[in-house]
Regions:
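Hydrophobic alpha-helical transmembrane segments
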Residues: 1-3
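Gram-positive cell-envelope targeting signals
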Residues: 5-11
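N-terminal topogenic membrane-targeting module
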Residues: 11-111
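Amphipathic alpha-helical scaffolding segments comprising HEAT/armadillo-like alpha-solenoid repeats
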Residues: 57, 66-69, 92, 98-112, ...
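Structural detector for internal amphipathic alpha-helices that build alpha-solenoid repeat scaffolds
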Residues: 88-99, 121-131, 152-163, 182-195, ...
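Alpha-helical segment of the N-proximal tetratricopeptide repeat
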Residues: 107-129
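Short inter-helical turns and helix N-cap capping residues of alpha-solenoid HEAT/ARM repeat scaffolds
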Residues: 115-116, 146-149, 177-182, 211-212, ...
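Alpha-helical oligomerization segments
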Residues: 326-330, 334-344, 349
């Protein structure tokens, strides 16, 4: 009984200490928010480029003092909040100078060198959140770290910052895996690099070399999103991939890239493909718009026994060309009451939303 009572007392004491810590953190945050947030936001959105001295004066901040880590953690939180709400309006030069005034780079590098594992990971994520900086000399020790989360966070930050060979890890490790979250983060990094004027890599080499199916698919998607038309001839080799998913994504991308040379191959392989890939082929042919595939689309509709595939074919015909619309009308006149609804759905997409 005494042991149980002691355990309860210990739990209550821990809860009180935890609550007190949260209260203290909240109080510190509120104090910093009241003192800095509005002026930091105003400086960040000011179209005039301000000097370090001007910003320090407006913030009433003494740059000679050594800032405390707890204070700087809150400052980075405020910077993150400003960036997340006003990203497209920010004067990046002023935003970066605020970081100089508070010595944020020094703080982040010290967190990476001396902080706990959690602090290190948070610092790495912060660099991306606030477009901060840490030297490659500090980052390099974590790029091959045995801890997966720390290693990946360091690699993504390196990709964010480096102008050298930031994606070398995909060359070095063909078995490098990507989770869904990793793919989202990597795409955000690519968008950031494009925005700041860094070169976009050619993705096709990793489609060819990666041993991981989802990594191949990710880079095929990026080829499409970045319209890397020069990669189309090599990407066309993926039409022979054993994976249905890789094959389908390659077909979709080749259509969006308008790689017309692939159309005969798509028509040739159509009949032996699973239904999902057949639909991708039809959509790709619709994107290519060569005006040479009307006969194929007509026959494909006539032979299709899957309603989903029939609908994709009708949509392709309807949007293909003037001759495509005539072919659509011709098929509609022949339609029985059972299939007439497919034509109505194609001509009036709102029906899909109302049903």
């Amino acid at each position: 009984m005494a042991t149980g009572t002691a355990g309860i007392k210990h739990l209550l004491l821990y809860s009180l200490e935890h609550a007190d810590l949260l209260f203290t953190q909240k109080r510190r945050y509120n104090k910093a928010f009241d003192k800095y947030y509005e002026e930091m936001k105003s400086i960040s959105l000011d179209s005039n480029t301000l000097s370090e001295e001007e910003i320090a004066d407006r913030l009433e901040y003494d740059t000679k003092k050594r800032p405390k880590p707890n204070e700087l953690r809150i400052i980075t939180q405020l910077l993150t909040e400003i960036k997340s709400v006003h990203e497209d309006e920010i004067n990046e030069l002023n935003y970066q100078t605020i970081q100089t005034v508070f010595q944020i780079t020094r703080f982040l590098e010290r967190e990476l060198q001396f902080g706990s594992k959690r602090s290190k990971i948070q610092a790495l994520k912060l660099i991306q959140s606030i477009n901060g900086y840490a030297s490659e000399a500090v980052l390099v020790r974590f790029l091959y770290h045995r801890e997966l989360e720390l290693r990946n966070s360091a690699r993504y930050t390196y990709m964010w910052l480096s102008q050298g060979d930031p994606f070398r890890f995909f060359d070095e490790d063909i078995g490098m895996k990507l989770r869904q979250w990793d793919m989202m983060e990597l795409h955000a990094i690519l968008e950031h690099r494009k925005k700041v004027g860094y070169n976009t890599p050619t993705f096709i080499k990793w489609v060819n070399t990666s041993a991981e199916e989802n990594v191949k698919i990710f880079f095929i998607n990026e080829i499409r999103l970045y319209n890397e038309t020069e990669s189309a001839p090599i990407l066309a080799k993926q039409l022979n991939a054993r994976s249905v998913e890789i094959r389908g994504e390659a077909i979709k991308t080749l259509g969006k890239l308008k790689y017309k040379e692939v159309e005969p191959k798509l028509i040739e392989m159509y009949n032996v493909q699973p239904e999902e890939v057949k639909r991708q082929i039809i959509s790709a042919i619709a994107d290519l718009k060569t005006d040479k595939a009307l006969g194929f689309l007509y026959n494909a509709y006539d032979e299709a026994d899957n309603w989903g595939t029939k609908r994709v074919i009708l949509k392709a015909l309807y949007e293909y060309s003037a001759m495509g619309r005539k072919t659509f009308d011709q098929l509609e006149r022949k339609a029985d009451s059972h299939t007439a609804i497919l034509f109505a759905h194609t001509k009036h997409p709102l029906i899909n939303q109302l049903n």
